[in-house]
Amino acid sequence: MWPLLTMHITQLNRECLLHLFSFLDKDSRKSLARTCSQLHDVFEDPALWSLLHFRSLTELQKDNFLLGPALRSLSICWHSSRVQVCSIEDWLKSAFQRSICSRHESLVNDFLLRVCDRLSAVRSPRRREAPAPSSGTPIAVGPKSPRWGGPDHSEFADLRSGVTGARAAARRGLGSLRAERPSETPPAPGVSWGPPPPGAPVVISVKQEEGKQGRTGRRSHRAAPPCGFARTRVCPPTFPGADAFPQ
């Protein structure tokens, strides 16, 4: 009789540990990651994301998984018994079927947009829906698998490019504003910073003089100082009591 050989879980290589983690639920993954540092490193490995199997789309709303900054590709695959509903053409669906698919689509869209906004390294987020296997055991279904009966939903791969394009446009606009802004230099000694202070109001003195021929009411206007922009600005008009101002 051959002796019974035992192997501890930590003796498995990284690939086997990632495969085991991919089939655990969220509570089991977190509990197993707390046992030792080696399993905790596997739990934080970004490669685990490409192996996860979701039982339903509602798992995407919870903080079940850790997204690392080194994650570059995100492929979400879940197994649904309603894949035959989501994979048919939209014009062939009933109102009830459209309502089901719209909830799926909006949930995944919002989740992927949040992931793209938080992780700048993500390049190609995608989602896939696979038919539920008859045996009840989750299986990984790729885009070329014969069991895959629907489209690859490649339109979700453009989410990252759209977010990246918006960020690039914002950076270009901010850069152009900074380029057009004049460089600010400190003022020279004795020169005040900012616009010049407003000066004294311009007063036009009006006096009455009596001529030799007895004519009264002749007015002599003092020349007013220039206003700076003679063609665009108008000097203030004369008003009663202007002689009371100091000369």
Curated annotation (Swiss-Prot):
GO terms for MF: ubiquitin protein ligase activity
Boundaries of every F-box domain copy: 6-52
Annotated segments matching region Disordered: 124-154, 173-247
Key words of the record: Cytoplasm, Ubl conjugation pathway
Gene Ontology cellular component annotations, sorted alphabetically: cytosol; nucleolus; Z disc
Family matches, as Pfam families: F-box-like
Extent of Pro residues compositional bias: 184-200
Tissue: Enriched in cardiac muscle.
Any GO BP annotation: proteasome-mediated ubiquitin-dependent protein catabolic process
InterPro entries referenced in this protein's UniProt entry, alphabetically: F-box-like_dom_sf, F-box_dom
Annotated pathway: Protein modification; protein ubiquitination
Gene3D superfamilies reported in the protein's UniProt record: 1.20.1280.50
Taxonomic superkingdom: Eukaryota
Family matches, as CDD domains: F-box_FBXL22
Location(s) in or outside the cell: Cytoplasm, Myofibril, Sarcomere, Z line
Main location: cytoplasm
Oligomer status and interactors: Directly interacts with SKP1 and CUL1.
Free-text function comment from the UniProt entry: Substrate-recognition component of the SCF (SKP1-CUL1-F-box protein)-type E3 ubiquitin ligase complex. Promotes ubiquitination of sarcomeric proteins alpha-actinin-2 (ACTN2) and filamin-C (FLNC).
Official protein name in the record: F-box and leucine-rich protein 22
Gene that produces this protein: FBXL22
